[in-house]
């Protein structure tokens, strides 16, 4: 989901995360931190934090950074000066300890979209369908990713950042994993199911290609996480490019799947010719179009409106309905009559 950004946007985002912090490098901010620390965080003058701040892991030093950031930002806005970023992020009003409340809310909206999608897959795809288990597992990776996204936007800490990034990478890689299985027909065919009208035959075990693809994806993910974990400093550029390559490959495959019948690349169902193109196939192309359009929001990076809504939070808002569109497509594809003719 986070990997559908164009090259330029992704690199800019990575660079911004690491270096775009003119606000926290300013002498004014540094002096404010010293004054605040002496006045509120010293042993003699320690100020107790509110319960929401303590529950979300804020320290006195963190609270000083927030207070100084907001004070300087308020003054800059009043004087008509530009708004600066601090530690690679725009200044947001916090709410109950949440650093980016809009992104938290929209992450939870995406979580809800995956809950709805999971319920739809379980309810409308027959249990014996060879792709059902893959879609269910992908839904769970999505649920996991959006929970950690909400946690990360609540408190931007090293551990929450890594859990967010690693969970997102797992979701994107698993999406590519099941896409290859679906489009290249690597799924195992059960002996008996409600999708086939053929005489029961011995079950087809998992193919060597399927096993090799599964092992490759596992190795790629483990290597990815290990590399980022063992480095002395998190490699933001590599992380974003990794997700981008996986995400764009996923999108490209489904875009090829959605091509007109006259130029079809994939045989969408093994029992049908390449020219067989049900109407719902167009939804895959619409999905790619919408994800690209949603990602374009990141091109218009701007200081948060009212210090609440920024381009990144709007991107999260846009991805929730896109997820619902995708689940609808997966179910329609799984319920096509051509699956009844699949044989081991």
Task: Describe the function of each predicted region.
Residues 1-20:
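Fungal secretory targeting signals
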